[in-house]
């Protein structure tokens, strides 16, 4: 039975902790992936104590007295309840004992110990489980003294659907819940799009939705330009289309040479039969396949499935290059720049990166590394536990595997060189912005806001973020304008709502800037959550609207707000800058700072317009079935597949509705009532 450990400095801490536990509880998906973590019984300090003035090493010494000699995970908190560090241990008592003396550690760990006001612990069955839990928590809580994976978008896949007379070819991102054959992961969305475009030319598979397919009466433009075989209007029979699907699956499964040989034979046979038009079709399809392979670069001959990781460091920046090989084909590569203190070794960074990287991604059979890591065996055991099959981690010394690692290493250094040059440029530009706007310090985080709407309809707000590393696209946010009190087209009212929602939530989650100590970033490795500069696309009226909200939230003294307004002729280069209490001013037309500010403004504008267009398109294409309660995507798809259109569903009888797969009598009655009560 566990003991509650009650040492720590708690002025307002307990309520903060309770909120933190609710905020960071495991999601259903995480409970499914990690069943042994379903209920995390954290030992925490919610009680008062005579020793509530303890902190740092002395506090840790008191915790150590009560810790077991068992594997588990520990969390360190600062005075305001923010997570400082998350670690795992084979033996909690021995591991945490290392923090009881400040003198034996480097500067990073010494600062971390001194900032510790509270700790929490959980005992796991094995060290492997502790490793998986540690990676999961680091990824969600972003403790500032850990190695952090900055950009962690899910990877796109190519899918070929099942259970249809004419399977379709789609791009897919997210959970693999759809019944389909999945091919990937691909390194980028553009790589998937390019591959699909070429596959359309090579195999003529459809890319339209099932409802579009069922309702077409004549072939679309893709058929005319030889990108689709038009199964919608039966321009191709089902057996021939099935052969095209089989060929596409074989090619994506790595049997490219076999597919090409079959096409070459078919081309020669068509030529012998004097069917030169058909021979030309095969020739063009072969050309498309060769185009894909020529752009894949290095393709392994002996490795069917592997991810390759190479790490490079220079100038305080770390780059990890990842290559994806599936079915003996190169599905692309991606560069990552994890946030890590210089005191971390390459081995430590790579090990932590791998654990976080595969927290929510499918694992390959083989993972190749450029660097030996201390806990390679433990990591392999953790990955095998997660994947329910044997996963191998290898540091190759020779052969094709070594060639792949060297190739990744070269790409890592090239990407690192580009990032260093870009960072140096951004740092200079940020220093220039501080001078131009007379800021007390160089901005470490800039947030830019803009609105977009069409005559007041489908109104949205958008926020983009930039720092010395460039645009932080994974931190962009969009806001659907909710207030019914705003007059359609009232840009000032929209901006007020966006700013209020953004910063009210920030205060709720992290407290005011002076409480969370992150507006200035007291440590260089602090994960910045508060901007010290806000840019608004607009003039005096807009910045007054923003200041009204910031004043209400008591943030007016912490954040500088600058408005960027177009000049009288609305031409680039004539922008006027507005700051509260100062005379509006302009910058020289060819000033690099002006160009950078224009880029920030234009990026916010682009993101706002894109968000608005997506919302408008969704509203335009809204299906009447979406308005019916308990009709999700699966039932909607079944109804459209059965009837062909929402219009026919609306006029269907109750008896006809019950004939649809997945539609019960109760649901059929709801659908019938919905359309007949109007």
Curated annotation (Swiss-Prot):
One of its GO terms (cellular component) is excinuclease repair complex. Keywords: Cytoplasm, DNA damage, DNA excision, DNA repair, Excision nuclease, SOS response. Residues 257-292 form the UVR domain. Residues 1-25 are annotated as: Disordered. One of its GO terms (biological process) is SOS response. It is found in: Cytoplasm. Residues 1-13 have a biased composition (Basic residues). Interacts with UvrB in an incision complex. This is UvrABC system protein C. It comes from Bartonella quintana (strain Toulouse) (Rochalimaea quintana). The gene is uvrC.
């Amino acid at each position: 039975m566990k003991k509650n450990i009650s040492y720590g400095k708690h002025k307002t801490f307990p309520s903060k902790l309770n909120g933190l536990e609710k905020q960071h509880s495991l999601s259903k998906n995480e409970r499914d992936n990690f069943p042994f973590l379903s209920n995390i019984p954290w030992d925490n300090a919610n009680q008062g104590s005579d020793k509530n003035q303890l902190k740092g090493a002395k506090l840790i010494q008191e915790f150590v007295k009560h810790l077991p000699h068992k594997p588990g995970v520990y969390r360190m908190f600062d005075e305001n309840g923010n997570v400082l560090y998350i670690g795992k241990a084979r033996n909690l008592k021995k591991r945490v004992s290392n923090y009881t003396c400040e003198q034996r550690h480097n500067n990073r760990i010494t600062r971390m110990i001194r900032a510790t006001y509270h700790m929490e612990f959980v005992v796991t069955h094995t060290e492997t489980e502790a490793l998986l839990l540690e990676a999961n928590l680091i990824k969600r809580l972003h403790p500032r003294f850990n190695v952090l994976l900055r950009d962690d978008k899910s990877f796109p896949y190519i899918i070929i659907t099942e259970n249809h007379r004419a399977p379709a070819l789609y791009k897919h991102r997210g959970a693999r819940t759809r019944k389909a054959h999945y091919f990937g992961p691909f390194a980028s969305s553009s790589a998937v799009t390019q591959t699909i475009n070429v596959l359309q030319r090579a195999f003529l598979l459809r890319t339209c939705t099932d409802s579009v397919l069922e309702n077409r009466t004549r072939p679309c433009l893709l058929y005319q330009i030889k990108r689709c075989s038009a199964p919608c209007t039966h321009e191709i029979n089902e057996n021939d289309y099935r052969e095209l699907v089989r060929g596409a699956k074989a090619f994506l499964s790595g049997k490219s040479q076999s597919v090409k040989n079959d096409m070459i034979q078919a081309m020669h046979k068509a030529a012998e039969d004097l069917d030169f038009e058909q021979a030309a079709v095969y020739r063009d399809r072969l050309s498309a396949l060769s185009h894909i392979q020529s752009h894949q670069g290095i393709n392994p001959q002996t490795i069917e499935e592997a991810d390759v990781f190479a790490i490079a460091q220079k100038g305080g920046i770390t780059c990890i290059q990842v290559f994806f090989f599936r079915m003996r084909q190169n599905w692309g590569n991606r560069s990552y720049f994890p946030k890590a203190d210089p005191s971390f070794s390459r081995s430590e960074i790579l090990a932590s990166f791998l654990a976080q990287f595969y927290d929510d991604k499918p694992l390959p059979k083989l993972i190749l590394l450029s660097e030996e890591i201390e806990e390679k065996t433990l990591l392999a055991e953790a990955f095998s536990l997660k994947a329910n099959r044997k996963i191998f981690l290898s540091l190759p010394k020779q052969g094709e595997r070594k060639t792949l690692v060297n190739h990744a290493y070269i790409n890592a250094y090239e990407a690192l060189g580009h990032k260093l040059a870009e960072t140096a440029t951004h740092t200079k530009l940020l220093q220039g912005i501080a001078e131009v706007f007379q800021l007390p310090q160089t901005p470490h985080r800039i947030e830019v806001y803009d609105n977009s709407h069409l005559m007041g309809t489908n109104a949205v707000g958008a926020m983009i973020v930039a720092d010395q590393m460039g645009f932080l696209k994974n931190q962009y946010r969009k806001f659907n304008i909710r207030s019914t009190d705003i007059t359609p087209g009232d840009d000032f009212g929209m901006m007020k709502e966006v700013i209020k929602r953004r910063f009210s939530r920030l205060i709720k989650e992290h407290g005011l800037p002076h409480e969370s100590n992150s507006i200035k970033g007291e440590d260089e490795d602090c994960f910045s959550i508060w901007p010290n500069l806000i840019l608004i696309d607009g003039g005096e009226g807009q910045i007054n609207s923003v200041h009204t909200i910031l004043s209400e939230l008591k943030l007016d003294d912490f954040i500088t707000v600058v408005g960027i307004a177009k000049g009288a002729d609305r031409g680039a280069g004539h922008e006027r800058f507005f700051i509260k209490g100062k005379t509006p001013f302009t910058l020289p037309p060819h000033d690099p700072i002006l160009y950078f500010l224009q880029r920030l403004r234009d990026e916010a504008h682009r993101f706002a317009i894109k968000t608005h267009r997506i919302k408008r398109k969704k509203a335009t294409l809204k299906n009447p079935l979406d308005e019916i309660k308990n009709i999700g995507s699966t039932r909607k798809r079944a109804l459209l597949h059965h009837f062909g259109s929402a219009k026919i569903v609306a006029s269907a009888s109750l008896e006809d509705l019950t004939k649809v797969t997945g539609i019960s009598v109760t649901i059929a009655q709801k659908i019938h009532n919905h359309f007949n009560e109007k």
